[in-house]
Swiss-Prot record:
InterPro entries: Ribosomal_uL3 (IPR000597), Ribosomal_uL3_bac/org-type (IPR019927), Ribosomal_uL3_CS (IPR019926), Transl_B-barrel_sf (IPR009000). Transmembrane segments: none annotated. Part of the 50S ribosomal subunit. Forms a cluster with proteins L14 and L19. GO terms for biological process: translation. The keyword Ribonucleoprotein applies. PROSITE patterns: RIBOSOMAL_L3. GO terms for molecular function: rRNA binding; structural constituent of ribosome. One of the primary rRNA binding proteins, it binds directly near the 3'-end of the 23S rRNA, where it nucleates assembly of the 50S subunit. This is Large ribosomal subunit protein uL3. Keywords: Ribonucleoprotein, Ribosomal protein, RNA-binding, rRNA-binding. GO terms for cellular component: cytosolic large ribosomal subunit. Belongs to the universal ribosomal protein uL3 family.
Length: 209
C-alpha cells in the first residue's frame, strides 16, 4: 500500500554500522502529520489523502484555509499536500501519522525543492562545454549559437542562461538507516533535495532495486 509522510530536513550527519563503517545520513523530522481530507473516486476522480504538517498561528490563516481545517476538526497546519493511496478505509480524517510507519532498511523516495542558485550561465545550468581559453579566443563561457539563420529566431525550450534551482526534485531508492519513533526522526542514507528546514515528502519507493 502506498504510504508517505511530510517532514522537515534537519541536516546531515553520519552513523556507524556494526562493521564500523561510517554511513552518511540525512536526518528528517518526519511528522506528526494529520489527515485533513480524503479524496474519493466518486467526488474527485481519484483516491488520495490530504496531509497537514507543521504549526501555524490561526490568525495567519486565510478564511478558505481556516474553514477547510475547521471542517476537518484539526489544528492549524502550515503545509497541505496530497498523497495518492489505494485503500481509503485505512485512513480517517483527523488521524495522526508518525515516523513509525517506516521500518529500518526500507527503501523510500524523497521529494523536495532544490536549493536556489540564482541566475546561472549555460555551463553551470545545463553542463555546456566551454570554448577555448586561449588568448585569441573570443568565446569562453558564452552559450554559442542559439538558432540557424533560416528561422531567424530562437525556438521555445532552447537551453539558455537563466534562473537555476528551486525545482521539484525526487531522489529514489534511499535506505532508511534508523527510525526514532519517540522524536519522529528518520535517518535516511545519502543526500536529499533542498536546504536545511525545507519541506520534504517521504514515501515508499516505486522502483525498488
Amino acid at each position: 500500500m502506498p504510504k508517505g509522510i511530510l517532514g522537515k530536513k534537519i541536516g546531515m550527519t553520519q552513523i556507524f554500522n556494526e562493521a564500523g563503517v561510517a554511513i552518511p545520513v540525512t536526518v528528517v523530522e518526519a511528522g506528526p502529520c494529520l489527515v485533513v481530507q480524503k479524496r474519493t473516486p466518486e467526488n474527485d476522480g481519484y483516491s488520495a489523502i490530504q496531509l497537514g504538517f507543521g504549526v501555524k498561528r490561526e490568525n495567519l490563516l486565510n478564511k478558505p484555509t481556516k474553514g477547510h481545517l475547521n471542517k476537518a476538526g484539526v489544528r492549524p497546519v502550515r503545509f497541505l499536500r496530497e498523497l495518492k493511496v489505494d485503500d481509503l478505509e485505512a485512513f480517517q480524517v483527523g488521524q495522526e501519522i508518525k515516523a513509525d510507519i517506516f521500518a529500518e532498511g526500507e527503501k523510500v523516495d524523497v521529494v523536495g525543492t532544490s536549493k536556489g542558485k540564482g541566475f546561472a550561465g549555460g555551463i553551470k545550468r545545463h553542463n555546456f562545454h566551454r570554448g577555448p581559453m586561449a588568448h585569441g579566443s573570443k568565446y569562453h563561457r558564452r552559450p554559442g549559437s542559439s538558432a540557424a539563420k533560416g528561422p531567424a529566431r530562437t525556438f521555445k525550450g532552447r537551453k539558455l542562461p537563466g534562473h537555476y534551482g528551486v525545482e521539484r526534485v525526487t531522489v529514489q531508492n534511499l535506505q532508511v538507516v534508523k527510525v526514532d519513533p519517540e522524536r519522529n526522526l528518520l535517518a535516511i542514507k545519502g543526500a536529499v533535495p533542498g536546504p536545511r528546514g525545507g519541506l520534504l515528502l517521504v514515501k515508499n519507493s516505486v522502483k525498488v532495486k
